[in-house]
């Protein structure tokens, strides 16, 4: 009976050592689930009224890109080229990402600013980066 308990205790100790959690994972900072709003330094725009804004969620590796300009001067081809260039810059800035895939089809929305009365166009792109 003593041999059985000794064998069971040694087996338990051995299994605890084999399946122990690595302490380096515990020392890492937890990933934030908040949305970071990023305004890129290099906007890659040719339209003077255009602005680019990114919303980045580090927990899910998702980025929402918003390209906004006057509706009169909106060109979807330029918006797509700007989005590709800004996403490439974002990928280069974050070394852990090697590519991305589109989560939803890109969309264009038109709206009117109540203060100024201008009509604006917003091009939206929603992507998830892969590690």
Language-model-detected regions and their locations in the chain:
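Sec-dependent N-terminal signal peptides
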Residues: 4-14
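Sec/Tat signal peptide C-region and signal peptidase I cleavage site
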Residues: 16-20
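Secreted/extracellular ectodomain signature
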Residues: 21-131
């Amino acid at each position: 009976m003593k041999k059985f308990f000794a064998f069971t205790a040694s087996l338990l100790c051995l299994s605890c050592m084999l399946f122990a959690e690595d302490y380096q994972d515990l020392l890492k900072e937890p990933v934030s689930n908040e949305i970071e709003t990023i305004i890129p330094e290099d906007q890659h725009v040719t339209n003077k009224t255009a602005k680019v804004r990114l919303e980045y969620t580090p927990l899910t590796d998702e980025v929402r890109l918003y390209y906004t300009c006057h509706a009169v001067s909106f060109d979807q081809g330029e918006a797509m080229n700007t989005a590709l260039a800004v996403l490439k810059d974002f990928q280069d800035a974050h070394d852990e990402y090697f590519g991305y895939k589109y989560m939803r089809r890109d969309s264009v929305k038109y709206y009117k600013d109540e203060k100024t009365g201008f009509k604006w166009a917003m091009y939206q792109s929603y992507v998830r980066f892969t590690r």
